């Protein structure tokens, strides 16, 4: 199990990926403790001095003007968590819950939230013990923070709700007891600090980003395979073309294609002196289209990494000045817009792949047997596999509709503009699955196309890609049950089978 020392505000993308992929043992860096304690002391001073401060001794949302008596402050925080745990939908999986929890710990430990070290340590203990609260997938509009998901997370600290421990759903009290943990009582400000934040939205979008990186690499490899299968030209990847435009993503993608399409390809040599002038756009413009997608991936990375390390609580405690200030860092608009832009990239990666599949089906364009199978008529070959890819690409076009422009007012119009970031991030998962299915079909088709260039081989790296598939999926000599082959190729892609052939591009 990975051990990670968490220095608040300094999580890297690779650390976040590891948290998502694997259980982790967290340790809070000692440098965070003074700031945490100072913020708590500031909150305690406000209560002791009788000053009114939102979230400390007031109601919430439209009820912010209601002053709460000192003797009710602890009950106020507990009631807040219980009432806001109103999510619906399927429970998030352990990986997603773990990522949300670590993001929440990272934010709270920045020392601007007025939450005690003991509460943060209780969250760390849940992560380390593998106790994952039941968090329904739906119910947040991404402002004021991800209230419902984070309330379900926080229920666990109170001994309420349910959790999964060692693969079993248990009542919270039972899960805590089995893990050797105790519930906590929340003090002033702590319930609000736990609930306010963009951690669910950010985690949803991060998963989309992590999987989009794999899709991108796989699509580049399959695009290169298809280029070989249809005897496409390598000239469009010439560095001089892309330097003349100056778009960095395009320049970098062309370099990836040159890395894959080396001069040691017998296929390339076989048509070196052909008279074809230009390839279709789905081949020739791969650096331009995929380069634009890469730019979106990189921009999304920057936004999400900043948000993963942000303090998105409200109000914020500035202990050095003894002030508590209400703001709007809980508004997840940056995450929503980043997820929307990432959705465009995922849709385009799939759309371009589908066009390359269609190209291989057309004997006039590909110079291959129709639908990539001999004895056509008796055999239908890849005919319906391409239809499946088209269906998935079409679904992605609808799913790519932006969520950040869709706001509905809540809390009696006190919270009158929201981000819809959770939905923006969550739909990425379905888009990823669709695009992975498209790329799987292209991988199958491109390898079949190269097989049909009998006696000719591609570059060493692309031959590795073909061999990886052929170890699990046989060449098509005649029609057979097709769906298991798509499932197999899809699973291999999800495991990073092609991603490892591409140098780091982020």
Swiss-Prot record:
Keywords: Cytoplasm, Histidine metabolism, Lyase. SUPFAM superfamilies: L-aspartase-like. The keyword Cytoplasm applies. GO terms for biological process: L-histidine catabolic process to glutamate and formamide; L-histidine catabolic process to glutamate and formate. It catalyses: L-histidine = trans-urocanate + NH4(+). The keyword Thylakoid does not apply. This is Histidine ammonia-lyase. Pathway: Amino-acid degradation; L-histidine degradation into L-glutamate; N-formimidoyl-L-glutamate from L-histidine: step 1/3. Transmembrane segments: none annotated. There is a cross-link at residues 143-145 (5-imidazolinone (Ala-Gly)). Contains an active site 4-methylidene-imidazol-5-one (MIO), which is formed autocatalytically by cyclization and dehydration of residues Ala-Ser-Gly. Gene3D superfamilies: Fumarase/aspartase (Central domain), Fumarase/aspartase (N-terminal domain). Its EC number is 4.3.1.3. Belongs to the PAL/histidase family. One of its GO terms (cellular component) is cytoplasm. Its main location: cytoplasm. Pfam families: Lyase_aromatic (PF00221). GO terms for molecular function: histidine ammonia-lyase activity. It is found in: Cytoplasm. The modification 2,3-didehydroalanine (Ser) is found at residue 144. PROSITE patterns: PAL_HISTIDASE. It comes from the Bacteria.
């Amino acid at each position: 199990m990975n051990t990670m020392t968490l220095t608040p505000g300094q999580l890297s993308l690779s650390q976040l990926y590891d948290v998502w992929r694997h259980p982790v043992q967290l340790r809070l860096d000692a440098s965070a403790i003074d700031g945490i304690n100072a913020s708590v002391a500031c909150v305690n001073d406000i209560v002791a001095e009788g000053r009114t401060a939102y979230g400390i001794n007031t109601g919430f949302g439209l009820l912010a003007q209601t002053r709460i008596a000192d003797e009710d402050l602890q009950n106020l925080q507990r009631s807040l968590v219980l009432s806001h745990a109103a999510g619906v939908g399927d429970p998030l999986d352990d990986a997603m819950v773990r990522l949300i929890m670590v993001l929440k710990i990272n934010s709270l430990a920045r020392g601007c939230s007025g939450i005690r070290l003991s509460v943060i340590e209780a969250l760390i203990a849940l992560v380390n013990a593998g106790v994952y609260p039941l968090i329904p997938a739906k119910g947040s509009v991404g402002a004021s923070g991800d209230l419902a998901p984070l309330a379900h997370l926080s229920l666990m600290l109170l001994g309420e709700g349910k959790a999964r421990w060692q693969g079993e759903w248990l009542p919270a009290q039972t899960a805590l007891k089995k893990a050797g943990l105790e519930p906590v009582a929340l003090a002033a400000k702590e319930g609000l600090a736990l609930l306010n934040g963009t951690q669910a939205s950010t985690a949803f979008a991060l998963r989309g980003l992590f999987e989009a990186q794999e899709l991108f690499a796989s699509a580049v490899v399959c695009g290169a395979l298809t280029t070989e299968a249809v005897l496409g030209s390598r000239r469009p990847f010439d560095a001089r073309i892309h330097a003349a435009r100056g778009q960095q993503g395009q320049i970098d993608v062309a370099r990836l294609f040159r890395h894959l399409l080396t001069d040691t390809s017998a296929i390339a040599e076989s048509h070196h002196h052909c008279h074809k002038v230009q390839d279709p756009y789905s081949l020739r413009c791969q650096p331009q289209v995929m380069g634009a997608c890469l730019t979106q991936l990189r921009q999304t990375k920057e936004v999400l990494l900043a948000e993963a390390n942000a303090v998105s609580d409200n109000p914020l405690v500035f202990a050095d000045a003894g002030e508590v200030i209400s703001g709007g860092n809980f508004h997840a608009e940056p995450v929503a817009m980043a997820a929307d832009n990432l959705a465009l990239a995922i849709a385009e990666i799939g759309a371009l792949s589908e066009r390359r599949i269609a190209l291989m089906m057309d004997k006039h364009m590909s110079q291959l047997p129709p639908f990539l199978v001999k004895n056509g008529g008796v055999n239908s070959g890849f005919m319906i596999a391409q239809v499946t890819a088209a269906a998935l690409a079409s679904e992605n076009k609808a799913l790519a509709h932006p969520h950040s422009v869709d706001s509905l007012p809540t809390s009696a119009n006190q919270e009158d503009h929201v981000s819809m970031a959770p939905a923006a991030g969550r739909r990425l998962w379905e888009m990823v699955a669709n695009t992975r299915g498209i790329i799987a079909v292209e991988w199958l088709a491109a390898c079949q196309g190269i097989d049909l260039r009998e006696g000719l081989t591609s570059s060493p790296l692309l031959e590795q890609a073909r061999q990886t598939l052929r170890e699990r999926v046989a060449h098509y000599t005649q029609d057979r049950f097709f769906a298991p082959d798509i499932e197999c190729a899809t699973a291999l892609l999800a495991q990073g089978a092609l991603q490892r052939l591409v140098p780091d591009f982020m």
